[in-house]
From Swiss-Prot:
Name under which the protein is recorded: CD99 antigen-like protein 2
Membrane topology: Single-pass type I membrane protein
Post-translational modification: O-glycosylated.
Glycan attachment points: 129
Gene: CD99L2
Annotated GO biological process: cell adhesion
Amino acid sequence: MVAWRSAFLVCLAFSLATLVQRGSGDFDDFNLKDAVKETSSVKQRWNHVTTTTKRPVTTRAPANTLGNDFDLADALDDRNDRDDGRRKPIAGGGGFSDKDLEDIVGGGEYKPDKGKGDGRYGSNDDPGSGMVAETGTIAGVASALAMALIGAVSSYISYQQKKFCFSIQHAAEGQEGLNADYVKGENLEAVVCEEPQVKYSALHTQSAEPPPSEPARI
């Protein structure tokens, strides 16, 4: 038991000696005072807040090192037009250029090259165009006449039907009038025939009575 206590005390003394030696002799060790200490070189954070605007970087197109690359600027240049890999001649060409467009827009007339035509399509270019147009005109006129004839026939038939219906109606009304007149005439004849018979019967009854007897004369 005593041996353990002595060993513990020896270790504790050795540890304290080591700590004291480090704190007194080694100045480069970590110290909390160094972290808290404020020096003149350290400035506040808000003093360093500054805004910097960077100039936008402009990207330039790389140089066209190869002549076969596609470039939109080449489409606007008439001098670099190619035909089957060969450059067209600048003068004496027979193509359609911007000059022709300027002439058309400016009010001038397009003047094509010799032997190439103006690109316009006329009636003389196609010999069958006149025949087709004439056939279409005849067909249109014939169809119009047929429609007019059909309309006239249908209107005439409807008119005749209406006329026939009205004639039947008038005939029926006239027949009814005749029947009414005939009935009235028969009634009048019956009345005329009945009155004389009544008078005759009255006279006949009077004549049938015997005459009164005369009294005897003295």
